[in-house]
Regions:
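ATPase catalytic-site recognition across NTP-hydrolyzing enzymes
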Residues: 1-35
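Acidic two-metal-ion nuclease catalytic site recognized across multiple nuclease folds
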Residues: 3-13, 193-221
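Short acidic, Gly/Ser-rich segments with clustered Asp/Glu that frequently serve as metal-coordination loops
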Residues: 32-44
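Acidic active-site catalytic centers that drive phospho-/nucleotidyl reactions
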Residues: 36, 100, 184-187
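Short loop/turn segments immediately following beta-strands, especially the blade-tip
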Residues: 50-55
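Mg2+-dependent endonuclease catalytic cores in nucleic-acid-processing enzymes, primarily RNase H-like
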Residues: 56-178, 199, 215, 219-221
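Peripheral docking tails and interdomain loops at the edges
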Residues: 178-184
Length: 221
């Protein structure tokens, strides 16, 4: 069964690209996936996006978790990730997934998965190294990002209707002192946030917003 695509890639007259969600009518600057496979428990995958325009009151862009999934079988897990990737990728483009490329177990599973896909003439599934993955402080980097973006009064991280917020609330109270992959939801979400937290438009914010508003009203650009 074909996967229905809900994202369109649009480009302003000045060349600034953005993603348009056909279901919610939201406009994103970037969409990425975060993927964590711990081997000993369920793997976790998230799709998240950062708003194109800044919230002027918070002086920050909202980040939205669009989808999530967890699976215990690696092949089923990777197929779910691929399905989500197609669902949230615009036509003729593929959003990137970020994960722990230093994990021997995960990379071996991924290599086997892709060997089968190549044998059948299907495009492989690629995972890009997540930000701060090799940094000594990575155990705190990802949880700190989640705490920062969910703090009262300045919340910019928003979740779809899933169990992820409840899981995170309980887990973030604990001291995460082991491998980040021991906490797949933290890892997968953290990988995505690490990318989206640094996204900026190529054009200056006021210029982009003004251009968009002129396009909407039909006034000359």
């Amino acid at each position: 069964m074909d996967v229905i695509n809900i994202i369109e890639k649009k480009i302003y007259a000045d060349g600034e690209p953005y993603y348009f969600n056909l279901e919610t009518k939201e406009k994103y600057g970037e969409i990425v996936g975060g993927l964590a496979w711990p081997e000993t428990t369920d793997g976790f995958v998230v799709i998240a996006a950062v708003d194109l325009f800044e919230d002027t009151g918070l002086e920050a862009r909202h980040i939205r978790v669009l989808a999530e999934a967890n699976e215990s079988d690696i092949n089923t897990f990777l197929r779910r990730a691929l399905k989500l990737q197609r669902h949230f990728s615009p036509f003729m483009e593929t959003i990137r997934f970020y994960g722990d490329t230093t994990s021997p177990a995960m990379m071996e599973f991924l290599d086997q998965f892709n060997r089968d896909r190549r044998h059948r003439g299907i495009t492989p599934f690629y995972v890009t190294e997540a930000p701060q993955l090799k940094a000594p402080q990575k155990l705190e980097f990802y949880p700190q990002l989640i705490r920062k973006y969910t703090q009262s009064g300045r919340k910019i991280l928003h979740f779809c209707d899933t169990a992820l917020p409840g899981y995170l609330m309980g887990l973030l109270r604990e001291e995460i002192s082991r491998n980040i992959l021991d906490h797949p939801p933290i890892a997968a979400l953290g990988y995505a946030l690490g990318v989206l937290s640094t996204w900026k438009p190529r054009k200056r914010e006021p210029e982009v917003r003004a251009k968009y508003e002129r396009v909407l009203t039909g006034n000359p650009v």
